[in-house]
Amino acid sequence: MAKSLLFGEQARRSMEAGVDKLADTVRVTLGPKGRNVVLDKKFGSPLITNDGVTIAREIELEDPYENMGAQLVKEVATKTNDVAGDGTTTATLLAQAIIREGLKNVTAGANPIQIRTGIRKAVEKAVEEIKVISKPVNGKEDIARVAAISAASEEVGKLIADAMERVGNDGVITVEESKSMGTDLEVVEGMQFDRGYVSAYMVTDTEKMEAVLDDVYILITDKKISNIQEILPILEQIVQQGKKLLIISEDIEGEALSTLVLNKLRGTFTCVGVKAPGFGDRRKEMLQDIAILTGGEVISEELGRDLKDVTIDMLGTADSVKVTKENTTIVNGKGDKVAIKERVSQIRVQIEDTTSEFDKEKLQERLAKLAGGVAVIRVGAATETELKEEKLRIEDALAATKAAVEEGIVPGGGTAYIDIIPKIADLTSDIIDVKLGIDIIRKALEEPVRQIANNAGAEGSVIIEKVKASEAGVGYDALNDKYVDMLKTGIVDPTKVTRSALQNAASIASTFLTTEAAVADIPEKENTPPMAPGMGMDGMY
């Protein structure tokens, strides 16, 4: 395919036009008085959102050079979202500001490579200073503030703080759509996996269609059980003790299933069978997790263990087990606490080592089931459009909260960036163009406050000067149009989000400035086939 080429200033300006189109679409969403953007969907209703990365992902421009610029800034938003989960609008805004200021200097004859050196130097200093002013998150109140600022809702803030308090830092919090109007929180205590009973005849409560077993033995195996003779010796031992049994296996079928159901219906013996969770190697690991949590052993031929030889001390135990049609929950497994801690440490190491996002997510779930718990925030709304928008807000708030717990918090509303400007201004260089790079970052750091003020109907430049003249930590509360101590008022941003937004914006923008040529495909013209004779409708009356 033939290529189209642009060079120098023309290439950079064409790409800058694309950067501006994307950034100008995203920037209107920043701050407590930021607006929403409507995204057209080919199927279903349009999506209304203020989530920077969701908007950026939808933007494709017709002009190939403009589209290149837009895609570069889209990467800023995506990378920030991947690392910190929030701050995508801020990152986009910073990238636009660095590119705009940088191109002015490059056009005036400055060396882009030296400018990039200055930008990197300034960003390193900025990140250091952000860490200096960072404060650790202390308790539920701080968590609620971070979430409330991100979601623009105090109710959501309290909900997320409750969820994090109940499942701990190792717990998993998921956001799902609710069928009702309200937004509520459900916490699953103990270990839950998505496998239900193999036969409805095993239920102990026919109204709720669930089986609840108290003080229960748990047989864990990766084998398929079809012959009752295989498990008869262990069943006899359990019956003698008058206990109940949960069997977790690949499957229970045939004679074994019918015998267990018959004994349950006669009231001789209560047993519930469920299929093992997961598939392949993940199944083996999950069975091992259950065994460690309950103090049992996995009965597997790979480990040289046969069902006929199972003894009581090979079984796991738990205070209670609840089995529904779709889920099994084991509460208060009686496993050895030291063994559980070792297993948790092992999973943490695997999480750090894995490069796959999918594997990381699954390992995190396993960790939560062993160490913390699982909380589900169910989001409800009157319409599907509102529900999608609310769900995106809560997902952002959740990511921001996790980031805050990791690295702490800084004054919000762009105040942290303003507070570190004097430290950036102190940086010097004998090379003029490197100094220009430092100045570019100094100016770009003002941009978030300016945009938050503009979106609130105030004059951005005036607000910036007032914040600069105030004490460190005092910023502009755009919601109430006043100047306050941001940390005391609860207007905070996660340190990780603030840091990542600047680092990712500077990385892409400084590379953009060094562009000297751009290459794009020339779209092929579609050849229209010649019209068949008579198709021109000549001679029609």
Curated annotation (Swiss-Prot):
E.C. number(s) listed in UniProt: 5.6.1.7
Catalytically driven reaction(s): ATP + H2O + a folded polypeptide = ADP + phosphate + an unfolded polypeptide
InterPro entries, alphabetized: Chaperonin_Cpn60_CS (IPR018370), Cpn60/GroEL (IPR001844), Cpn60/GroEL/TCP-1 (IPR002423), GroEL-like_apical_dom_sf (IPR027409), GROEL-like_equatorial_sf (IPR027413), TCP-1-like_intermed_sf (IPR027410)
Gene Ontology CC terms, in alphabetical order: cytoplasm
EC category: isomerase
Domain of life assignment: Bacteria
GO molecular function terms noted in the UniProt entry: ATP binding; ATP-dependent protein folding chaperone; isomerase activity; unfolded protein binding
Record-linked Gene3D superfamilies: GroEL, GroEL-like equatorial domain, TCP-1-like chaperonin intermediate domain
Amino-acid positions noted as binding ATP in the UniProt annotation, renumbered to this chain: 29-32, 86-90, 413, 477-479, 493
Keywords: ATP-binding, Chaperone, Cytoplasm, Isomerase, Nucleotide-binding
Subcellular location: Cytoplasm
UniProt main location, coarse: cytoplasm
GO BP of this protein: protein refolding
Pfam families: Cpn60_TCP1
Leader sequence segment: none
Listed NCBIfam families: GroEL, PRK00013.1, PRK12849.1, PRK12850.1, PRK12851.1
Similarity field: Belongs to the chaperonin (HSP60) family.
Subunit text: Forms a cylinder of 14 subunits composed of two heptameric rings stacked back-to-back. Interacts with the co-chaperonin GroES.
UniProt function note: Together with its co-chaperonin GroES, plays an essential role in assisting protein folding. The GroEL-GroES system forms a nano-cage that allows encapsulation of the non-native substrate proteins and provides a physical environment optimized to promote and accelerate protein folding.
Protein name in the entry: Chaperonin GroEL
